[in-house]
UniProtKB/Swiss-Prot annotation:
Record-given protein name: Zinc metalloproteinase nas-22
Residue stretches making up the EGF-like domain: 232-270
Role summary: Metalloprotease.
Reported tissue expression: Expressed in uterine seam (utse) cell.
Residues bound to Zn(2+): H138, H142, H148
EC number: 3.4.24.-
Cofactor: Zn(2+)
Keywords assigned by UniProt, alphabetized: Disulfide bond, EGF-like domain, Glycoprotein, Hydrolase, Metal-binding, Metalloprotease, Protease, Secreted, Signal, Zinc, Zymogen
GO molecular function term, any single one: metalloendopeptidase activity
Length: 367
């Protein structure tokens, strides 16, 4: 029997910082996170909505040079790469009658996109206040036809709100209303890139029902189930019979490999993901210190900017059957307590379903 935890560091502000963890074991058999889940949500309840898919699974786009901040271009391109590497969706700059116009709206700090393929020359606004690839994926998934996770019909099983939604202004009601037409495709994952953060100081944000997931909400990491719901909706599949381990499935972008839950790797998800290390749990505590250095990206004018995506370190902790592994995060060097742990942190995989996001920690307050 093996357990593992994933060390995450976003390539934005955590440069070469240390995280110190202690690993141990005790003689107790314990089953964690055995709850059953309903399937995920998507707007697709009528013939009208079905026409909002992109033809031939290809999204055409162009950058509107008169009003686009090219410092965020890398974020969008990386987001497209992430989606196309895990699904059958392709992004093309070939001219098309129906395409997305990429702009940067300087009048707002918000980024936004229209839901699904809705018209010619439709809008996708992305500016420097958004910047990261994770936020760009969020908006691109809207463009593919998906609503927020917290607008699912089953969201009240996982979230609660401080105020009745009808007390909010119209803008926020639109962001939190449950859409009439939905199809549940994958389990609810509060770590979805489509889930808004848990902001306890903001009256209109959702609050998690389970305290351990507080810093998981608002993630900038694309969840396993985010890719799977795209593949299901766009009917992406592989003709071969590749056998995938550990709940993986054949990757429609490369049918010789599997899409694996975070922490698993190799062509068939039978190995530990790389880079990483494997430890053997013992009856006494072991100290482990991990350092990740994200580095920077440089523009042509030598302007130095944070990176747009995460780097990862995957640790497997091996233990005999009928043993429970104990993990204690001792400290973060300059860790930041931010919703979604968007500047880096640790995810300790505790869910029985390894495809679901587990609790994330990013500072002493959460560890």
């Amino acid at each position: 029997m093996k357990s593992f935890f994933i060390l995450l560091s976003i390539l934005q502000e955590c440069y070469g910082k240390d995280i110190v963890a202690r690993i141990g074991g005790r003689n107790v058999a314990e089953k964690i996170g055995g709850a059953r889940h309903r399937r995920q949500v998507l707007i697709r309840g009528s013939d009208e909505e079905r026409r909002h898919k992109w033809f031939n699974n290809t999204v055409h786009y162009y950058f509107y040079e008169e009003n686009f901040d090219f410092t965020v271009k890398e974020s969008i391109l990386r987001a497209m790469e992430l989606i196309s590497n895990h699904t059958c969706i392709k992004f093309s700059t070939e001219p098309s009658e129906k395409s997305i116009r990429m702009e940067s709206d300087s009048t707002t700090i918000a980024c936004y996109a229209e839901i699904g393929q809705v018209r010619e020359n439709q809008l996708f606004s992305f500016n420097s206040d958004c910047y990261s690839a994770g936020v760009a994926v969020h908006e691109l998934i809207h463009s593919l036809g998906f609503i927020h996770a917290h607008q699912r019909s089953d969201r009240d099983q996982y979230l609660e709100f401080k105020k009745n939604l009808d007390e909010l202004n119209q803008t926020y009601q639109e962001q939190y209303k449950i859409w009439e037409y939905q199809e549940i495709l994958v389990p609810y994952d509060v770590g979805s890139v489509m889930q808004y953060p848990n902001e306890e100081d903001e009256e209109y944000y959702p609050v998690r029902k389970y305290r351990t997931m507080a810093n998981t909400m608002g993630s900038a990491i694309v969840a396993f189930y985010d890719y799977l719901m795209i593949n299901k909706y766009y009917e992406c599949s592989c003709a071969n019979n590749l056998s995938c381990k550990n709940h993986g499935y054949p990757n429609p972008s490369n049918c010789s490999q599997c899409n694996c839950p975070y922490g698993f790797g190799g062509a068939d998800c039978s190995q530990r993901a790389e880079p990483g290390a494997t430890f053997q749990a013992t009856e006494t505590w072991q100290n482990v210190t991990i350092s990740l250095d994200a580095g920077y990206r440089y523009l042509e004018n030598n302007q130095k900017l944070p990176q747009v995506d995460f780097i990862y370190q995957f640790l497997w902790i091996m233990a005999p059957a009928n043993k429970t592994t104990q993990i204690r995060v001792e400290k973060f060097v300059e860790g930041k307590c931010l919703p979604g742990c968007i500047r880096g942190g640790v995810e300790i995989k505790t869910n029985e379903d390894p495809r679901l996001t587990s609790p994330r920690l990013c500072c002493e307050e959460t560890s």
